[in-house]
Amino acid sequence: MLHMIETRLQDKLKPGLEVENFQKDGDIYLSLNPDYLSGDNAKYMTMYNRMARWYDMSEKWIGPLLHGKSIDKLRRDLMEEIEWKDNLSVLYVSIGTGQDLRYIPETIDLKSLDFVGVDISISMLEKCQKSCAKKTNLQLFHACAEDLPFADNSFDIVYHIGGINFFNDKAKAMQEMLRVAKPGTKLLIADETADYVDQQYKKNHFSKDYFKDATVDLSEIENAVPSEVKEKEMKLLWDGKFYALTFRK
């Protein structure tokens, strides 16, 4: 079984990369390009590494306390933007602790998915590995969105939820996600709007220092989408606190 998983993973890697040559932290493949570890990438990597220990507890208790069941609806709505089918290859960029996996439609057999998750925070990935690895055929990579270690046209599904607002190079990240998606794939890019960042992150005791100078410009996000895509659409969800940007390769 392990050999089969590694063979499938090898087929997705950039030419010249070999599964057996990656350094690993437990079962997490290490592929972080230090050229992108500056500015906001470095700042928010540090933030999530520090918050990882309490992140899931906050999501479980504080989120519902503040927002009730509306946050569950948001996550289900986001998953409905993706064209799920059994037996597909999936790339989730900024997978975090993997809690969104439980909102994948119940009609989908999670263990049939060939699932790869990427995140810039090793601590979030370690939490993800502990909580999600047994639920699906999940392989995790410590990497940045601007330099994915995967070959062109490798994934049936590619999506990103949470983080791109503060990537160093949004256009490069979107180009990378488009590059590794198979032709015809519908991609999802989603994150908080300025309203949520201002009302929540800039006032939260644990995050306010990281976000005090942060700005979110939806036009900047839209303009970062590669010009060659088709069917580009921007939706506002959760009473305008979240956006879902979709397009097709």
Q: Language-model segments: which ranges?
A:
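Short glycine-centered segments of the SAM/dcSAM-binding site in methyltransferase folds
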Residues: 89, 185-186
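Short catalytic micro-motifs in class I SAM-dependent methyltransferases
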Residues: 162-163
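A conserved beta-strand element that flanks and buttresses the S-adenosyl-L-methionine
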Residues: 159
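C-terminal alpha-helical "lid/dimerization" subdomain adjacent to the S-adenosyl-L-methionine
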Residues: 186-246
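Short beta->alpha hinge that forms the Motif I/post-I loop of the SAM-binding pocket
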Residues: 119-120, 169, 192
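A short glycine-rich, Lys/Arg-flanked "PGG" loop and its adjoining helix->strand segment in the class I
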Residues: 171-183
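Class I SAM-dependent methyltransferase SAM/SAH-binding core
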Residues: 89-147
